[in-house]
Amino acid sequence: MADTETDQGLNKKLSFSFCEEDTESEGQMTAQDIGGAQSQKPGREESEELEGPVPPTRDELHTSLSRDKESPGPDLWKSVSGPPKCPETPVLHSKSKLPVPTNFSTPKNSLGQPEISLLEKLSSRSSRHMRLTPASLMDEKTSLSLVNINPFTPETYRKLLLQSKGKRKTRDYLEETGEEESKSVQWLPAKRSILQETNMASRYEKEFFEIEKIGVGEFGTVYKCIKRLDGCIYAIKRSAKSFSGLSNELDLHEVYAHAVLGHHPHVVRYYSSWIEDDHVVIQNEYCNGGSLQAAISENTASNNHFQEPKLKDILLQISLGLKYIHNSGMVHLDIKPSNIFICHKMQCDSPVGPEEAESEADWFLNASVMYKIGDLGHATSISKPKVEEGDTRFLANEILQENYQHLPKADIFALGLTIAVAAGAESLPINGDMWHHIRKGNFPEISQELSDDFYGLLKNMIHPAPKERPSAAALARSRILWPFLEKTDELQKQLNLEKSKTATLKRELKKARHIQTPQREVHHCYYQICKGSRHLLVGGRRKAPSSFTRGTSSV
């Protein structure tokens, strides 16, 4: 009887969610059992106060499970194949090709429910209790399933991250550990719902002071904010879609890409991201000059446009940013004026001297205006692309035809049309005959005359054949964009020639010194010998030793 009382009390402590079982067990208890239960009641109340709110009941659990069964299955993770025949012109809308379901669920949730054990009952408890209990294999797999896998990190890096000290395994490994273990993992809670449950208090209101709304785009709304701790201004972007409504990892590509890219002078800097109120929040660098599109609109209103020197400056700086992105194994795929941002350097900023410049990008650190690439929502990997079409006005034809062999050249095509718009070209067509006319290599009409070299470079950037377009690295070292590069090369050749002459003179001087050194040593020795012999001869004639003189005189 004592063992029965202990087991019943333990089961009552471990499973609060099964209220019906507790009611039935209380109805079958004897008077002695009731007395034992009453003696254990204060301990139960204390545990409830320490552990927080009671988890959902069985009815609520059944409702949530049935909802998960109705959610989409593994088809969510497969890319939708295009139509049998590639379109000849883009459609009017620029929506994603991939389906966007309203309810999200991992593929494993579509399978049957396994038997619920005591360990699974413990997993439904609060996170505070889980930290106080020993971690089991199920807990480790649960926490692993809640970790996002960044598609832009190398496979070896991900394995090193997840196999630290041989304790953590990749998802592929977990799927191959057998049917029994896979069944236990199949009914794990969805990653996104867990992130919502563990969401902290409003970080946005706690850490930032909102100044104004500065932009609204496809991703969401951007606010200008001051961080309360450091007093600096940041651009806080809040997603329009709810986090639970995001269809797939493409919606998180901006976070993934920013996290991998790191810091570059010509890419908008990324600081942090988090989930708040079921929306993705991204903390980025604030560019005080706004977007290039806003500057173009102001120029159009005043019947003024960027002149060739400024156009070259924009093209060169964005080429440096694209070169960095492409060298990182990614492409942007949505280059356009609204995704290029301007930073005006403050007067208090000190310029960087030549001795501090470590790369070609540092040449512009002392420039008064910096141009940066932002909005990496369409970024994808070059080796394993998952392409989502950007703005059709700047879209290369090969992307429309789903030819992804030369993805970096699609960014070059879009950059060429971006410079055309900045130079004064009218609004680019979304589709139709004019759209195809530009894709045949015809540069849009502009209201100003450009030099032949620069115009030829821009026209080559929108060449119909992707292979014929220059790379971002080639643009970054183009003599057309570097007006002083030819003169610099000439001065560098003269400097190298003078260095060669100086080195030759040094070698000849060293050789001459080496020849003169033995002669000086011979003359010095001869002088010392002659001086010593002369001293002996003179001393012998003039004066005898004092002891000998005294001895002679005494005799």
From Swiss-Prot:
Entry comment describing in which tissues the protein is expressed: Ovary-specific.
Transmembrane parts of this sequence: none
Pfam families documented for this protein: Pkinase (PF00069)
Basic and acidic residues bias locations: 57-72
Record's compositionally biased regions (Polar residues): 26-41, 102-112
Motif (Nuclear localization signal): 167-169
Result when mutating L316A: Abolishes the cytoplasmic localization
Effect of L311A: Abolishes the cytoplasmic localization
Alphabetically ordered keywords of this record: ATP-binding, Coiled coil, Cytoplasm, Kinase, Magnesium, Meiosis, Metal-binding, Nucleotide-binding, Nucleus, Phosphoprotein, Transferase, Tyrosine-protein kinase
UniProt catalytic activity: L-tyrosyl-[protein] + ATP = O-phospho-L-tyrosyl-[protein] + ADP + H(+)
Catalytic center residues: D334
Residues that, per the record, bind ATP: I214, G215, V216, G217, E218, F219, G220, T221, V222, K237
Record keyword Repeat present: no
Binding, Mg(2+): N339, D375
Gene Ontology molecular functions: ATP binding; magnesium ion binding; non-membrane spanning protein tyrosine kinase activity; protein tyrosine kinase activity
Predominant location category: cytoplasm
Annotated phenotype, changing S15A: Abolishes phosphorylation and impairs ability to maintain meiotic arrest in oocytes during the germinal vesicle (GV) stage and metaphase II exit during egg activation
InterPro entries: CC_SR_Kinase, Kinase-like_dom_sf, Prot_kinase_dom, Protein_kinase_ATP_BS, Ser/Thr_kinase_AS, Wee1-like_protein_kinase
Motif Nuclear export signal: where in chain: 310-324
Family named by the database record: Belongs to the protein kinase superfamily. Ser/Thr protein kinase family. WEE1 subfamily.
Protein name: Wee1-like protein kinase 2
